[in-house]
Amino acid sequence: MERQVQRLRQTFRSGRSRPLRFRLQQLEALRRMVQEREKDILAAIAADLSKSELNAYSHEVITILGEIDFMLGNLPELASARPAKKNLLTMMDEAYVQPEPLGVVLIIGAWNYPFVLTLQPLVGAIAAGNAAIVKPSELSENTAKILAELLPQYLDQDLYMIVNGGVEETTELLRQRFDHILYTGNTAVGKIVMEAAAKHLTPVTLELGGKSPCYIDRDCDLDVACRRITWGKYMNCGQTCIAPDYILCEASSQDQIVQKIKDTVKDFYGENVKASPDYERIINLRHFKRIKSLLEGQKIAFGGETDEATRYIAPTILTDVDPNSKVMQEEIFGPILPIVSVKNVEEAINFINDREKPLALYIFSHNNKLIKRVIDETSSGGVTGNDVIMHFTVNSLPFGGVGASGMGAYHGKYSFDTFSHQRPCLLKGLKGESVNKLRYPPNSESKVSWSKFFLLKQFNKGRLQLLLLVCLVAVAAVIVKDQL
């Protein structure tokens, strides 16, 4: 593994990945891969998650194509140097911020959306000019296999490589020195990744999870709210890191919410949910048993049926849930939706704040002031008002967690920034030494006074202002020279 990382690092140091034209070519090649091998990719995703090809395309492939298109359209601007404001002491110099690639980065993908959560960070790494090792999740073995087959056919093999395997391979990867690590997965493994990265002072982006609350105000269109919640909760059989984990509502609304979600489940998946091509399955038996155990001792208002042979768990609603019960102590990551009663929005806010900061927060209300109040008085990775999941689809918004739900962010511009170093550059001339004497020993009260004048004044590039400042600096330089 060390030799493979070193091979990528040597290629990176050669400068091959830095030219803008090369980055665009690699992104175009990645887009060709997705388009030309779409059927193979969809078949792999479907095999891993019992997902229809239509759902695989809409849940994963379309997002990757959108991310690539964004980078192709915006990369010239993102990669350009940005001028920086200057003070009087540097007004005649060139000051700018130049994004530069970090080097060799490691991307560890997740199994629940094995295509998009593995390749979307890679789009940002390529755009920023890095070399990258991609480690797909071994739990989504079919998608991991197709990625290992396809990526070397389309991308530069000396800069981008796939490493497949389980815990042993991941552990060996984490022993290597990288310039950035982006990990998507659970908190326990996130801590392992961060500990390994700390040995090399490697920065990390951790996309973790948590219990994303969904508050439903009584002043709300329950038909719309429950339809959107049903879609976001049971999509991918609940195996979505930003799925609404539980509902907070007033007790008077609980029965209506249960009934409307039940009706919506039938609209979406039919009378026989198990036979619906749009309803997925739990990834493996271990996760199936964990999720099923969360039903023990709970009041099941709807659903609850399970089939171990096919790893099927029906869309399920729990009511009168004890906040201290097991189902409220861990991220569910499955099709179980607890409802917890609160007296009002104040109690809902306190309930949220008494727990770890979630990856997402959802608020449904006709009252925008109430929505913004909940936003202002809580903390979460992201927020969507009057819908769920959808902030993930807006690549002009950063996607990431806070606190226990993660650190750092990506998507669109934020992916480019995550995999870049914003390098400050100041280019000075060799003239103007009379002013520069202000910083040379010996020091004096006069020098300090003039330094404050030069260093604490900012200026913009208006022509008249620039002309006046040039004259001012020239006069000041003469005065300083005489005084020193």
From Swiss-Prot:
NAD(+) binds at residues 185-190. It is an enzyme of class 1 (oxidoreductase). It is found in: Microsome membrane; Endoplasmic reticulum membrane. Pfam families: Aldedh. One of its GO terms (cellular component) is endoplasmic reticulum membrane. It comes from the Eukaryota. The N-terminus is blocked. The modification Phosphoserine is found at residue 293. Its main location: membrane. Residues 1-463 are cytoplasmic. GO terms for molecular function: 3-chloroallyl aldehyde dehydrogenase activity; aldehyde dehydrogenase (NAD+) activity; long-chain fatty aldehyde dehydrogenase (NAD+) activity; long-chain-alcohol oxidase activity; medium-chain fatty aldehyde dehydrogenase (NAD+) activity; protein homodimerization activity. The chain crosses the membrane at residues 464-484. Homodimer. Belongs to the aldehyde dehydrogenase family. This is Aldehyde dehydrogenase family 3 member A2. The gene is Aldh3a2.
